């Protein structure tokens, strides 16, 4: 099977390609220069030339709360354009199977736990990443519409919880929470800081899955695509407080300082726990526990840092 993987240079893409099962398939992994997803005619030409059997859409403009608040236009427009362009070009080229990666930010902000796939578009979105969420919802809905118009097409959406792991961005201003905290605590250790600041009161809860597990789910899905639901949550079914994540990371890195809370800072949704019922029925569950995943991620960061 020939698979086009968009976003091959990102964390999810790199984890897919590093997975032991990747060698069983022929992957096409264009960079954004080789395949500009903001230009539909480029995509059409590329698909006609390479003729993939299956597409995994993992490309996107991503970032943590800082980046989403500061760049709402970019997060909405570019993510939406990439999704619409790729999906419609794939349909035009008669590519029958496509796995679209969504995000748990697609869910309403007031539905804090037990988020089921049918809750999409049932309430107001969290304002701090609304643009990104709208783009992801648009792609998921477009997948549904394409299938509805022609049942020969199977365009489906996986909705992972928050991710972390190897190949992530470790930048306090533009990264997701876990890599940002790892970098923050490593810096505190190196500079002898006795305190580390946490945004908010530390009681907001988040569900984070090791990205290697998502790659494992994707290979399971490729082999069981017909029985995969239209939209499916992919997560642990368990969450932790922000403070608990800080404590686990501090323990692994050996940081002995204290945490202080800046309650004037935004924290996003208070809770965002997805429901794993359909995932369990589909027959997949995650393999890597939180402490093991964070330990591997810390080691990856330190290795990369020492090699710079």
UniProtKB/Swiss-Prot annotation:
NADP(+) binds at residues 7-13, 101-104, 136, 160-163, 176. It comes from the Bacteria. It is an enzyme of class 1 (oxidoreductase). Keywords: Isomerase, NAD, NADP, Oxidoreductase. InterPro entries: Epimerase_deHydtase, GDP_fucose/colitose_synth, NAD(P)-bd_dom_sf. Pathway: Nucleotide-sugar metabolism; GDP-L-colitose biosynthesis. One of its GO terms (molecular function) is NADP+ binding. Its EC number is 1.1.1.356. Belongs to the NAD(P)-dependent epimerase/dehydratase family. Fucose synthase subfamily. This is GDP-L-colitose synthase. It comes from Yersinia pseudotuberculosis. The lineage of its organism: Bacteria, Pseudomonadati, Pseudomonadota, Gammaproteobacteria, Enterobacterales. The gene is colC.
């Amino acid at each position: 099977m020939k698979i086009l993987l968009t976003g091959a240079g990102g964390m999810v893409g790199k984890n897919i390609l590093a997975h032991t099962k990747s060698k069983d398939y022929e992957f096409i992994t264009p960079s954004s220069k080789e395949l500009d997803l903001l230009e539909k005619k480029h995509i059409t030409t590329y698909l006609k030339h390479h003729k993939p059997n299956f597409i995994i859409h993992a490309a996107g403009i991503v970032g943590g709360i800082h980046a989403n608040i500061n760049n709402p236009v970019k997060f909405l427009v570019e993510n939406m354009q990439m999704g619409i362009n790729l999906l419609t070009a794939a349909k035009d080229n008669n590519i029958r199977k496509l796995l679209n990666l969504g995000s748990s930010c697609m869910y309403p902000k007031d539905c804090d736990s037990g988020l089921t796939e049918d809750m999409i578009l049932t309430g107001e979105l969290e304002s701090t990443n609304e643009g990104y969420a709208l783009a992801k919802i648009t792609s998921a809905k477009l997948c549904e519409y394409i299938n509805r118009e022609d049942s020969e097409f199977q365009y489906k959406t996986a909705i992972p919880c928050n991710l972390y792991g190897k190949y992530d961005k470790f930048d306090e201003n533009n990264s997701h929470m876990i890599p940002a905290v790892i970098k923050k605590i490593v810096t505190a250790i190196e500079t002898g800081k006795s305190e580390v600041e946490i945004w908010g009161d530390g009681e907001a809860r988040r569900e984070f899955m090791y990205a290697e597990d998502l790659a494992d789910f994707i290979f399971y899905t490729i082999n069981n695509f017909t029985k995969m639901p239209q939209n499916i949550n992919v997560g642990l079914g368990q969450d932790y407080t922000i403070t608990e994540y800080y404590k686990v990371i501090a323990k692994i890195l050996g940081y002995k300082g204290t945490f202080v809370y800046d309650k004037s800072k935004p924290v996003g949704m208070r809770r965002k726990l997805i429901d794993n019922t359909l995932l369990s029925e589909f027959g997949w569950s995650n393999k890597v526990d939180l402490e093991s995943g964070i330990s591997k991620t810390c080691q990856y960061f330190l290795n990369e840092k020492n090699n710079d």
